[in-house]
Amino acid sequence: FYGDQKRAPEGPHLLKKDGWYYLFEAEGGTGEGHRITVSRSRTLMGIYEPCPYNPIMRQWLPDAPIQRCGHGKPVMTQHGDWYIVYLCGRMIDQKYSMLGRETALDPITWTPDGWPVVNHLQGPGCQQKKPLPEIPYYSKDKDTGFGTNFLSCDFMTPRTPTLHGIQIQNGILTLEGSHADL
C-alpha cells in the first residue's frame, strides 16, 4: 500500500476495530505538508481503501502555532474515548522548531460509517480538556532535601544537562541560566 497521497508514506500503525483493520500513516514528508492519513480493510493483507476524510490530521493554516503533524497512533481510554497521539512542531518564524518534534494529543470521533475523524477535521488543537481527574506529578509537600551533593530523580531531564551553573550548598539549590542551543 503506497498511502493515500502516494507521497512518502511512513510510520504505519495498525488498529483492529469492529472487524476492520485501520492503517494510520504519516505522509507528505516532515515539513509543512506532514499529515496523518488512514485506510482500512477487512483483511490484514488488504486491499486497503483510503478514508474519504483524508488527511484526518493536517495543519492547513500557515501561521498557526502547531505545524508538521504526523505519525499518529490511535489510543482508547478506559472509558471508551478515543484519542490520537502524534508528533508535531511549534514553529518560530515558520522556519524553526526550537523543541524539535513534540508529542500532541487530539480527540478522535468515529463516523457512522466507521471512519476516524480527528478534532472534527479542524487541525491540531492547542489545548484539550482532561477526561480524567488531575493527578499531581509531584507532591507540593515533598522535601527535596538538598542536604546531599546529589540531586534526586525528581530533577531528571530528557537531555543530558551541563552541570555548569548547578550548585548545592547548605541545603540550597542554585541554578544559573546559560546561553545554550537545544
Please place each PLM-identified region on the residue numbering:
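Carbohydrate-active catalytic/glycan-binding domains of CAZyme proteins
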Residues: 1-182
